Regions:
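Extracellular hydrolytic enzyme modules, especially secreted metalloproteases
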Residues: 51-52, 58-182
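Active-site-proximal segments of metallohydrolase catalytic domains
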Residues: 1-78
Length: 182
């Protein structure tokens, strides 16, 4: 899937907010929903069903740099709010959410084990993944194999489920053939 972006129109005057942008909860989601029609109206765009809107909001005291509603792998539109930032990493990360991608996490086990079942001892650390754009580290590497699979770049035949100790030869995920993920 290829998505191309071109620089679109920029509002000559900012949209005035009657109150400070909400940082969390329903009010933050409501902000994203309400800003979209107003921005497109001012831009003179009536059909925005296949467009992505990037909004740079002023500082509001939020701990996040960007926010976007979760879409799906086949989404063709979305809204991204940037909190006083125009970082390409933040834009890419938030666009990932509009495509249906969650955060890259890792498994942390309190008993010093390298791996284990999800339990009281082994838990996910949100944003813990450090190898792709959906983590909390500014990287330019490809998406991890789980996110590639979610986007449809890898199909089920390229993923092997392993239930016991065995040797699996892995192919790079950008090759068309072979097992690319366990």
């Amino acid at each position: 899937r290829t998505i191309s972006f071109t620089v679109g129109k920029v509002l000559p005057e900012p949209i005035s907010l009657v109150s400070k942008m909400a940082c969390s909860g329903f009010a933050a989601s409501e902000f994203l929903s309400s800003i979209k029609p107003e921005a497109y109206k001012r831009l003179g765009i009536s059909d925005y069903s296949k467009r992505y809107l990037v909004v740079i909001a002023p500082k509001a005291g939020c701990v996040w740099s960007g926010r976007a509603p979760l879409g799906g792998p086949k989404s063709v539109s979305g809204t991204v709010a940037l909190h006083d930032s125009a970082s390409s990493y933040v834009i890419s990360h938030e666009l990932g959410h509009t495509f249906g991608l969650g955060h890259s996490n890792f498994l942390r086990c309190d008993n010093a084990a390298n791996d284990g079942a999800w339990s009281d001892t082994c838990k996910a650390v949100e944003y813990g993944g450090t190898v792709d754009i959906m983590g909390n580290i500014d990287v330019t590497t490809p998406l991890n194999t789980y996110h590639q699979w979610r986007m449809g770049y890898l199909d089920d035949s390229q993923i092997k489920q392993v239930w016991q100790s065995e040797v699996v030869n892995l192919s790079p995920s950008d090759f068309a053939n072979g097992i690319s993920a366990i």
